[in-house]
Amino acid sequence: MANNRDESRYKKWETDHEKRGTSDLIPAATVVIMRDSESGIELLMLRKNSKVAFGGMWVFPGGKIDETDKVINSDGSLDELATATNAATRETLEEAAISVSQENLFWFSHWVPPAITPKRFSTYFFATKLLDGDEVTIDDSEIIEHNWFRPHEAISLRDAGEIE
């Protein structure tokens, strides 16, 4: 269910789109890291520094696909999923200091927002489970905070405007 904040954000996007037109897609990858807890499954979320893109928002580890992530097939074509997998493992290590084995990453979705969105990421979504002994470490630069949320808790906090 949409709330007033969502409606005003959509109106801004709509106005911006009319002025600017369709934006190019930016290839990206993100990882939903899960762990078991006494209260059930929890998801790792990271809070971005207010001075960087998506500042202040709570996000899953992830980001843009870099040139160094690219995997080229023998026929010269780009292997998009392998490339996204490389980016997912790199971003998780950079943002949360968690080394994720590619064998433990499970690709589950690919999202492309509508053309009206001002900044459009073509995002590959992966899931993995936190392994015993892995600990989250943030750099206090790009990422300033981390927390483990139950899925319904994160949605409720977002709907209440307590996290973005």
Each predicted region: which residue ranges?
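N-terminal leader/linker segments that precede catalytic domains of diphosphate-processing enzymes
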Residues: 1-164
